[in-house]
């Protein structure tokens, strides 16, 4: 018998950071000439929406979108290696934290959010990727 506080471990709960979301696209890209001078955008639905709104702009500027709707910074941090580092971009633009504030994956403190964002920045810099941080948009609970 399942306890009341146990979650169903169905397929949607086994990939909490959503590593599979871009897995097939990442395999195709790998380390190719197409990645040369590429900039990856890492974030949540706001980021994901940018390339949906203006796909030509992303394509002509060699921008790659790795935003996932509803994502929080702990999920983004786990995805950072396969969705950014392993693609060998010259730069990454990181926008995250809005869904942390909203509590999408549980309560978060400002320190938790900034630690996750700074960890992504450190990983990027250690891998010779220029890092650009976007500020969290104003939110109200």
Where are these regions (language model features)?
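Conserved beta-strand elements of the Class I
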Residues: 40-42, 64, 92
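Short, basic, glycine/proline-bearing loop/turn elements
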Residues: 13, 63-68
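Alpha-helical cap/lid subdomain in secreted, periplasmic
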Residues: 56-62, 71, 78-141
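Short hydrophobic segments within beta-strands
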Residues: 42-43, 134
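Catalytic nucleophile serine of serine hydrolases
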Residues: 45, 69
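N-terminal secretory targeting modules
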Residues: 1-41, 47-48, 52, 56-57, ...
